[in-house]
């Protein structure tokens, strides 16, 4: 990863109060958001994607009956150089934590990144995702992003 920061002074948003529930039988926006809210930003590992407003509860769509989850994330800058890493991390975290029946779709929010189409194409290509996950350095970074302090 580059040692040069693209976003030296990111805006930090207040976290929403963490909510818990006792019924864990269904997968919905609430449970899916809780699965990914603590993913760390690759450029600022002391901050979560939620802290930077890259992920919000509103960016999570779930259809339990159709076994479908869509996450739309917003990079902090239109020229952010790590949106693919962020998207891959979200994808991996959800695939690892959701029941196997779910199809997971991760996308950059429309108009939020200069290379939105390219990033979305990469994240939607199973062969590219599989190839990326064979890179030990990238896997190490993704694991670091998913670590909960």
From Swiss-Prot:
What does the UniProt keyword field contain? Chromosome partition
Q: Give the family this protein belongs to, as stated in its UniProt record.
A: Belongs to the MIP18 family.
Natural source organism:
Arabidopsis thaliana
Task: Output the Gene3D superfamilies linked to this UniProt entry.
Answer: 6.10.250.1280, Fe-S cluster assembly (FSCA) (3.30.300.130)
Q: What does this protein do?
A: May play a role in chromosome segregation through establishment of sister chromatid cohesion. Unable to complement ae7 mutants, and thus probably not involved in the cytosolic iron-sulfur assembly (CIA) pathway.
Name the gene behind this protein. AEL2
Task: Give the SUPFAM superfamilies listed for this entry.
Answer: Fe-S cluster assembly (FSCA) domain-like
Pfam families per UniProt: FeS_assembly_P (PF01883)
Lineage of the native species? Eukaryota, Viridiplantae, Streptophyta, Embryophyta, Tracheophyta
Q: What is this protein called?
A: Protein AE7-like 2
